[in-house]
Amino acid sequence: IGGLAKGHMVREIDALGGVMALNTDATGIQFRMLNAGKGPSVRAPRAQCDKKAYQFRIKHTLESEPLIDIHQANVAELIVKDDTITGVTTSLQMQINSRSVVLSAGTFMRGLMHVGLKNESGGRMGDATSTVSDSLHALGFHVERFKTGTPCRINGKSIDFSKTEVQ
């Protein structure tokens, strides 16, 4: 959580009353100041959190909020009436109407996975790719794909920890 690229966003969410920073404080297992030896304009706090504890605390916070209804689904289409988004239709044909919609697309819009020389449509760990990009395109939005990469994982048993230093 935080870092050079996203630390300002965490601070903005905190300033607006969000719980991201509070949850990070409660579930953090390592806190560092990046670029501590450089000038103040390039310093940035970063925290590593216990992933499961962070998820459970955020889930509890959201589920405890009386004015929030939580639906987990793959949004297939945006419902538009008179140039206003009034809801969404899910891939299971469930219609959810709302006065406002926050679209958090993540990385699954037209998701394409590359494994070696093979390419296939999809998201992480077998999840389906999102089709909401087709709905956005039909509404006149320019939708692009951005390539992200996940490096190979290292087997912890192959590391000689005697040659590392504690941070």
Question: What is each of the regions a protein language model found here?
Answer:
Residues I1-E77, L92, S104-G122, D127-S133, ...:
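Conserved N-terminal/central alpha/beta ligand/cofactor-binding core
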Residues I68, I85, S98-R99:
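Local beta-strand N-terminus motif with an aromatic residue
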Residues V80-D83:
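Catalytic cores of nucleotide-enabled group-transfer and carboxylate-activating enzymes in metabolic
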Residues T89-S100:
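Core beta-strand elements of the Rossmann-like FAD/NAD(P) dinucleotide-binding domain
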